[in-house]
């Protein structure tokens, strides 16, 4: 009885405390939009195109310990450009790391990220030798790669338009450039910086999609209240653009041209994880999931979307927990307070709780999931970008201290190409006098010659007598051998049983066959009385091909050569004898 009473008292005390936290005005954090419920489609089951595999396992780790957080990857002239922690943009050539530029200020460590800067989105300009950089803290920049001249396009202090509320951008994230030079970019959150991503996961969606017009120096808002707007992908015809909503586990399509211009719709919904940067090509889009999610492993963005009071309580409790350290650091700046505040709010602190599964999804331009790559060994965890480059998939990440890569599933396999193949002896006269069977078409044979006694012509200078009967030959599967070095001697063995033709190959001669089109000497078919030798026929003059015969390759044959057997004939008494 006392235990139940104590439990009831504790529950009542917690409820009072809970109500005080969510109802008390003025408590941090302050958000643009009020906390309210919103719906996120549950992740799809790993079936069909999403079926699990192990393609991302055993990823090769490049430049380990030399790059920290290569978030976005773009390539040109066999060089990979990426932004890393510390605010630098670097390029990678083979095993070399070269500094390209830096937007932020000098800093000591990652906990000073707001001072260092954090380049997230990168794109090559279509109007010059420029690099467009979306720095999470310092805004949208244009950097001349030849002179390193930096031009600020959109400032973080600039108030930007919204569908209902105008406000500055807090997280400059994805960026892409159209053929005409217009820059599309995303603001992931209007309430929190990137070092407070945990708070952003509790707040209501406030992301935006912008189009920056260079001639007017104006950013036009296209979409508002996106659930952490992230990567971008322009369609091949640039008639629409796709934006990743990380917090909603979906891709949203915005029409730029045509009858639906200015309208948006869901492109892909229910992704099994949180999408990040998008990599488009002619066939579709690579969609990396920076954190996987399924029914057994829900993520923080979607766990309490239908419970705004719970999200508000958690956000305020977390803000109150770090409030003393923020105040201490403002009065007396110190590394301990800075590290603690950064650890509490930064999403990297909770990556240890992420599921083991790593997933990259392939989507076509019709919004269909056509394939996926998976891994479970965390050799390439928290993938934020996929770059298909030199038959590999390079995998960017905001947290890894290396650049991972795996073999591309679309890598071309080496193939053996044979051109202008000519058979040696091509164009010579046919040397087989046996008429073709009705069941199997055979090449046209030269007219046969009938002599009183049967003989078989060999390739030696002295004739070799053989005996041939007039009985009907039944061969279900004739063996055909083509040679390129020496002429072929053909010996036909006639039997009354359904056996393949028996061939007697000489030691220094190729296999004998029943049918061939490449032998240089004719074989005569006769009605025998008694076997007597005859002198060999004169050799047929060989027509030399205009082009040399192809080089022989040592490729194993699918069939085994026939064993050397003795010649079997039927004598007048009907008995099989061997010669």
Curated annotation (Swiss-Prot):
Segments on the Cytoplasmic face: 1-6
Family according to the record: Belongs to the strictosidine synthase family.
PTM statement from Swiss-Prot or TrEMBL: O-glycosylated. Glycosylated in the ovary of 4 day old females.
Regions that span the bilayer: 7-29
Keyword Secreted found: no
GO MF annotation list: arylesterase activity; hydrolase activity; lyase activity
Membrane association type: Single-pass membrane protein
Primary site of residence: membrane
Species for this entry: Drosophila melanogaster (Fruit fly)
Superkingdom of this protein's organism: Eukaryota
Keywords: Cell membrane, Glycoprotein, Lyase, Membrane, Phosphoprotein, Transmembrane, Transmembrane helix
Region (Disordered), start-end ranges: 427-579
Role of this protein: Transmembrane mucin that may be involved in cellular adhesion and the innate immune response. Membrane-tethered mucins are involved in many cell surface functions and form a physical barrier around cells to regulate cell-cell and/or cell-substrate interactions, and protect against pathogens or harmful extracellular conditions. This mucin likely acts in hemocyte adhesion as it is released from hemocytes during coagulation and is also able to bind lipophorin particles which form part of the hemocyte coagulogen.
Location of this chain's protein in the cell: Cell membrane
Biased composition (Low complexity): 435-529
Residues bearing carbohydrate: 213, 217
Name of the protein described by the UniProt record: Adipocyte plasma membrane-associated protein Hemomucin
Tissue: Detected in ovaries (at protein level). In larvae, detected in the fat body, salivary glands, imaginal disks and gut (at protein level). In adults, expressed in the cardia, and in regions of the ventriculus including the area posterior to the cardia. In females also expressed in follicle cells.
One cellular-component annotation, GO: plasma membrane
Extracellular-facing ranges: 30-579
């Amino acid at each position: 009885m006392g235990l139940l009473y104590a439990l009831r008292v504790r529950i009542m005390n917690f409820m009072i405390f809970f109500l005080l936290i969510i109802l008390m005005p003025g408590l941090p954090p302050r958000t643009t939009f009020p906390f309210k419920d919103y719906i996120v489609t549950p992740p799809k089951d790993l079936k069909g195109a999403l079926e699990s595999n192990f393609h991302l396992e055993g990823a090769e780790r490049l430049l380990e310990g030399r790059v920290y957080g290569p978030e976005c990857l773009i390539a040109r002239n066999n060089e990979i450009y990426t932004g890393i922690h510390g605010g630098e943009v670097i390029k990678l050539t083979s095993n070399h790391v070269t500094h390209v530029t830096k937007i932020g200020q000098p800093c000591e460590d990652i906990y000073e990220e707001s001072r260092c800067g954090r380049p997230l989105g990168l794109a090559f300009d279509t109007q010059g030798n420029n690099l467009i950089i979306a720095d999470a803290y310092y805004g949208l920049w244009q950097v001349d790669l030849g002179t390193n001249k930096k031009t600020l396009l959109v400032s973080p202090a600039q108030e930007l338009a919204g569908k209902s509320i105008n406000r500055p951008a807090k997280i400059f994230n994805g960026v892409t450039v159209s053929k005409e030079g217009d820059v599309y970019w995303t603001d992931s959150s209007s309430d929190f910086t990137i070092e407070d991503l945990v708070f952003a996961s509790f707040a209501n969606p406030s992301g935006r999609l912008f189009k920056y017009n260079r001639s007017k120096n104006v950013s036009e808002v296209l979409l508002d209240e996106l659930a952490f707007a992230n990567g971008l992908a322009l369609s091949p015809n640039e008639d629409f653009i796709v934006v990743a909503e990380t917090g909603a586990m979906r891709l949203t399509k915005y029409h730029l041209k045509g009858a639906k211009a200015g309208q948006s719709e869901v492109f892909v919904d229910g992704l099994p994880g949180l999408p990040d940067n998008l990599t488009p090509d002619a066939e579709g889009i690579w969609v990396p999931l920076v954190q996987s999610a399924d029914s057994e492993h829900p993520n923080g963005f979607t766990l309490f979307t239908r419970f705004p009071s719970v999200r508000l309580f958690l956000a305020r409790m977390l803000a109150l927990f770090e409030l003393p350290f923020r105040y201490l650091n403002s009065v007396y700046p110190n590394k301990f307070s800075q590290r603690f505040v950064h650890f509490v709010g930064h999403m990297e602190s909770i990556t240890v709780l992420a599921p083991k599964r790593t997933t990259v999804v392939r989507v076509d331009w019709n919004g269909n999931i056509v394939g996926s790559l998976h891994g479970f060994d965390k050799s390439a965890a928290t993938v934020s970008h996929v770059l298909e480059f030199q038959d590999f998939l390079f995998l960017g990440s905001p947290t890894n201290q290396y650049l991972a890569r795996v073999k591309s599933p679309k890598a071309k396999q080496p193939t053996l190409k044979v051109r202008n193949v000519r058979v040696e002896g091509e164009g010579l006269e046919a040397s087989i006098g046996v008429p073709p069977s009705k069941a199997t078409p055979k090449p046209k044979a030269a007219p046969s010659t009938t002599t009183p006694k049967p003989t078989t012509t060999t390739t030696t200078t002295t004739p070799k007598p053989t005996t041939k009967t007039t009985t009907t030959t039944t061969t279900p599967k004739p063996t055909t051998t083509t040679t390129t070095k020496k002429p072929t001697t053909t010996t036909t063995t006639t039997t009354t049983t359904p056996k393949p033709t028996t061939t007697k190959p000489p030691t220094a001669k190729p296999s004998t066959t029943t049918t061939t089109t490449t032998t240089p000497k004719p074989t005569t078919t006769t009605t025998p009385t008694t076997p007597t030798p005859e002198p060999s026929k004169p050799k047929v003059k060989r027509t030399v091909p205009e082009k040399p015969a192809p080089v022989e390759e040592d490729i194993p044959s699918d069939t085994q050569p026939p064993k050397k057997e003795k010649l079997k004939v039927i004598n007048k008494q009907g008995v099989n004898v061997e010669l």
